[in-house]
């Protein structure tokens, strides 16, 4: 398990009490809202802390508030983000992933795959990568077995797609 930092423990427990005090299991919330077939599928996709975080985030989103995921490295922030992206897709929204590190595009895509988002919801849209940095592509695998599956758009193509898009929708195919 993960130890909740002392300064966040009280607030975290109070937020979770709202669910558990009403006899609501966060796994049931995630199963329902992310449209998983069973609790076992949820448990295979996420760790317990991630399930709690996703349930709390959904609660905040439903009342028009934000949610910050700020755990230590290796706790699964990307997996939580992938879960929220799945929720967004279920709500008919377009998920947006912004990162200061271009290498995280591959990480978030791996998390999207690992939570079954590509299987259950059909095809995930082609990522609209605006970063033209050297590492901004999406890779599957590591090292010599690595294969590029998505590349960023060229700057000219990106500008053209954005300028031509006046409807508020992403360009066709994205």
What do the predicted segments below correspond to?
Residues 31-35, 51, 66, 86:
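A generic structural signal for ordered alpha-helices
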Residues 14-45, 78, 89-174:
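SF2 helicase/translocase NTPase motor core
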